[in-house]
A protein has these predicted regions:
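Short helix-boundary/capping micro-motifs
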Residues: 30-44, 119-133
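A short LG(V/I)-centered, amphipathic sequence patch enriched
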Residues: 58-75, 147-164
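Short beta-strand-centered segments that line the small-molecule binding cleft or hinge
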Residues: 107, 192, 216, 237-274, ...
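Central regulatory/effector-binding core of bacterial HTH transcription factors
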Residues: 122, 127-144, 148, 198-257
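Flexible hinge/capping segments at coil-to-helix
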Residues: 194, 263-300
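Hydrophobic hinge/microswitch elements
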Residues: 235-248, 254, 312-366
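Secondary-structure junction motif
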Residues: 284-285, 299-320, 388-392, 396-398, ...
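A late-sequence structural motif
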Residues: 365-407
Length: 407
């Protein structure tokens, strides 16, 4: 369930993804026009082709998607659920396709887009083929077909691999988010029959792993006992990238001020403060008062540069003679911090909520140094236009907040 950040996989093949983009466009056209005849005209296909496309989509969905009257055909509740996801998918995809060539909106296929995504991520046709489980010539041909319609190369050859052009990067990103919408359409449709389909992928910082997730997962299992949950770990920057490209559904941890980029939104759950800690046998353990000068002569275990905790740590020593300590170990691992504090005279700077359990068990000790002005928001970061599935929404509603007390 829990794993470190790795090369992102191509999105799993969902039931709705099995249909061609042309079929899905015909599905939307029927809903928009209320007429198979008119939809066929708009999509430049025959009426039997549209009828066949609708039949196949309904069979895959396992649900009737349309109601019919003598005057028109219209989406029922299940059809509206699917249409919402398909519309969102093309909302991502069509602008990026049109930027390369308007013809791509007609000719591009799911297989071609998956090949583009894989080559962009691996920067190599052979590695992309391995990732997709295809032959190298098949991947090369799929990308070449996109390039032929676009009338331009999508990749530049460099000594280090294939680098996607800017329009190709935009299309690969849009395609990834579009395919994610089609994958989540399966989950939305399953909700209508009380089935469990899909998964939740969470980007987690150290505080989220130690405080937020255990309680939320335990509560979630009472409602969704079988739905897979995957935890992705890594530096904040990597997790943010994974969030923006759709590899994780949401990111839990310390929020940034200002928000890191315009296409994400942050929601505050509560505030946490920083605490300075030592091992229980440390020379400073048990002291009633500690001055800044007492802290500068010991080695430290601290978070990496660029993190909120590290910023507060540096501020502590901003007025100290000689500045911040130089003999530091940079890590986000509370386990490594705990062991270093236990076996040496290292001091630590970490989240109070994250350290509470260790302090309560007597594995480390909070130092009496005023950190009341280090309050920082903890919460959820999501893509700005994200539409959660019912399961994802339930999980977010179950995220714990700490009891009201002075941190």
């Amino acid at each position: 369930m829990m794993g470190a950040m790795m090369s992102p996989p191509i999105l799993s093949e969902s039931k709705i993804q099995q249909h061609s983009l042309r079929h899905l466009r015909a599905f939307l056209a029927v809903i928009d026009t209320g007429s198979i005849t008119r939809a066929a005209e708009l999509c430049f296909v025959s009426q039997p082709a549209v009828t066949q496309a609708l039949s196949k989509i309904e069979k895959t969905a396992g649900l009737m998607l349309f109601s019919r009257t003598p005057q028109r055909i219209f989406a029922n509740s299940a059809g509206e659920v699917l249409a919402r996801r398909v519309e969102r998918a093309f909302g991502y995809l069509d602008p990026a396709l049109s930027e390369l060539s308007p013809r791509l909106r007609v000719t591009a296929t799911t297989s071609q887009l998956k090949a583009l995504i894989a080559v962009r991520e691996t920067e190599n046709f052979t590695l992309a083929a391995r990732q997709l489980g295809l032959s190298q010539p098949a991947v090369y041909r799929a990308v070449s077909q996109l390039e032929e319609v676009a009338a331009r190369p999508l990749f530049e050859r460099t000594p280090y691999g294939l680098v996607a052009t800017r329009p190709a990067q935009a299309l690969a990103q849009a395609a990834r988010l579009a395919l994610l919408e089609l994958e989540q359409a399966d989950a939305d449709l399953a909700e209508l029959t009380a089935a469990e389909i899909g998964r939740i992928v969470i980007g987690a910082t150290p505080l989220a792993k130690s405080y937020l997730l255990p309680k939320a997962i335990a509560s979630f299992r009472k409602f969704r006992p079988n739905l897979p949950i995957q935890i992705q770990e890594g530096p904040y920057g990597d997790l943010l990238t994974a969030l923006r490209r759709g590899d994780v559904d949401f990111l839990l941890g310390a929020l940034r001020d200002p928000p890191p980029i315009g296409d994400v939104e942050q929601k505050v759950l509560f505030h946490d403060t920083i605490v300075l800690v030592s091992g229980c046998s440390h020379p400073l353990a048990g002291r009633r008062e500690i001055a800044i000068e007492d802290l500068t002569s010991f080695p430290w275990v601290v978070a990496q540069k660029g993190t909120p905790i590290r910023r507060y740590f540096d501020q502590i020593f901003s007025d100290a003679e000689g500045g911040a300590p130089k003999n530091i170990v940079e890590t986000g691992s509370l386990i490594l911090m705990r062991e270093l504090l236990d076996t040496s005279e290292h001091l630590g700077c970490t989240s109070r909520l994250q350290a509470e359990a260790e302090i309560a068990r007597g594995l480390m000790q909070a130092l009496p140094f005023d950190m009341s002005k280090t309050s920082r928001p903890i919460g959820v970061t999501v893509r700005k236009d994200w539409l959660p599935t019912a399961a994802q929404r339930t999980f977010l509603e179950l995220l714990p907040t700490p009891p009201e007390r002075d941190l």
